[in-house]
From Swiss-Prot:
Keyword DNA-binding part of the UniProt annotation: yes
Family listed: Belongs to the transposase 11 family.
Protein name: Probable transposase for insertion sequence element ISH11
Single biological process term from Gene Ontology: DNA transposition
GO molecular function, one term: DNA binding
Classification via Pfam families: DDE_Tnp_1
Function: Involved in the transposition of the insertion sequence ISH11.
Any coiled-coil regions, as ranges: none
Keyword annotations: DNA recombination, DNA-binding, Plasmid, Transposable element, Transposition
Length: 330
């Protein structure tokens, strides 16, 4: 049963008029029925009906993350609230086993759920022509034995957890991401996430910090018709070039007719703060610290946080509010 169906029922019409909430607003413009198409949520081959309600449970988790409620038990407790489980479309509160199993199974397809929401954001024109890429830390619970000791070069400290590489655009809109073992991800990760971002739509600029000063990354983007802007890291060579950005050198290898002004590159690179704001916004949605014991649930939580950020942006856009706002006003 969908929230819309519930609101059409005269017996609860007055109820929802009284409790108009951010939860109802979150699900007003997006349908999650597409989750039922994934095989992972299908009944077991033995014929036993699995206690799965994918659209309702997805709405339930998004509600909880929006309210800063994480972890299987806290989520299950929150979904016992009559206002909440009715708002999410349940006929009755889900069991703890159902909540746990949904998160476990969701991990298999959560990146596809994220991709679906990215498409919805793109259809609404929420992307712009500058993409920014960056990695961020994902702190884990001490009891998470799958997490490892990671180094955060930004804060010059070690932490227990994982990492996430994100490409964002527009008003704090994540469009591609990969869950990683640590914040310092290998070059292959940057290449995969970059390809995923370009598959959504082609920008004019792709901005990264000096960690993305690699030939393969620059050449791949230039070949795709995108201008990469990352500071030249002179420490990568014994014979440093007299340039500020790697693209100043690589552009000559790809085109003799293209020239880039230093001021234009500087102005474009300054937009990199956009991905930092996106990272902070997604951390507010639950990415910053996982409340999971194990990599599977940790990865699911990270992508749920990314999904929530997209849902909030789309909801605000549809309601005529600022898509970049982290909250929904009702």
């Amino acid at each position: 049963m969908s929230p819309a169906t519930l609101q059409d029922d005269p017996s609860v019409d007055s109820f929802f008029n009284v409790v108009e909430t951010e939860t109802l607003a979150l699900f007003e413009h997006l349908s999650f029925e597409f989750l039922e198409e994934f095989d992972v949520f299908a009944p077991a081959e033995t014929g036993r009906t699995r206690d799965h309600e994918p659209p309702e449970l997805m709405r339930g988790f998004l509600h909880c993350y929006y309210k800063d409620i994480y972890g299987i038990r806290p989520v299950e407790r929150e979904l016992r609230n009559t206002v909440v489980w009715l708002s999410c479309g349940f006929d009755r509160p889900p069991s703890r086993d159902a909540v746990d199993r949904f998160l476990t199974d969701l991990e298999h397809v959560v990146n596809k759920v994220f991709d679906h929401l990215v498409e919805q954001a793109a259809l609404r024109g929420l992307l712009d022509l500058t993409y920014c890429i960056d990695s961020t830390d994902v702190r884990a619970m001490p009891a998470d034995q799958d997490a490892s000791k990671c180094y955060d070069p930004t804060d010059d400290e070690y932490y227990h957890g994982y990492g996430c590489t994100i490409v964002s655009t527009g008003q704090k809109i994540p469009i591609a991401a990969e869950f990683t073992e640590s914040k310092q991800a290998p070059e292959e990760t940057a290449m995969r996430v970059t390809r995923d971002a370009l598959a959504v739509a082609k920008p004019i600029w792709m901005v990264g910090d000096s960690a993305y000063d690699t030939l393969d990354w620059h050449d791949h983007l230039l070949a795709a018709g995108v201008v990469p802007v990352a500071p030249y890291n002179a420490r990568n060579t014994d014979d440093p070039k007299d340039i500020e950005y790697r693209v100043e050198d690589r552009i000559e290898q790809h085109s003799e007719d293209v020239q880039l002004k230093q001021s234009t590159l500087d102005e474009t690179y300054n937009r990199r703060t956009g991905v930092e704001r996106t990272n902070e916004s997604v951390k507010d949605c639950g990415l910053g610290r996982t409340h999971a014991r194990g990599r599977v649930h940790a990865r699911a939580q990270v992508f749920l946080a990314l999904c929530l950020r997209l849902v909030v942006a789309i909801t605000n856009y549809e309601r005529g509010d600022n898509p970049g706002s982290p909250i929904i006003t009702v």
